[in-house]
Amino acid sequence: ATQIGRTARVSLRVNPDVDAGTHPYISSGLKGNKIGVAHEVAVATYQRAAHLPGIEVVGIDCHIGSQITEIAPYLDALDRVLDLVEAIEATGVTLHHLDLGGGLGITYTDETPPAADVLIAQLLAKIDARGHGHREIVFEPGRSLVGNAGVLLTEVMFLKPGEQKNF
């Protein structure tokens, strides 16, 4: 970014270490999962990123899995992420947005996932109750929007080394 005279606005995905109660292959919110900066090092990672040239830290993201059929894991993850937001901002780094991901489930056989509006109402109530309603809030309800509507094509670009295995 600095080479072309720009500032890159970045948001880091953190791993809140929350069990979404979904299949292990589509779980992404537990400590041993492949996605996100570990909860224990998130504050230090944000501090480091905030001091890099050409970087403006603007938000925090998390994703706890896919095909989630309960609201409780989202609320648990939100509490943990808001705890991190407060710890990060206590160091002088301002976060403007909060991105909560995790694919709200769809019915394949006998699943009964909550409706997206019910989930969002509960998340917004918690965000407001904790004093974070002034932030831009992004929700990623995943397959509940597109589960029966398309195909995803991807390419692996990088591998992430983990404590117990590589992803």
Please tell me what each predicted stretch does.
Residues 1-106, 112:
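Conserved alpha/beta-domain cores
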Residues 66-167:
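C-terminal active-site-proximal or functional interface alpha/beta core segments in diverse enzymes
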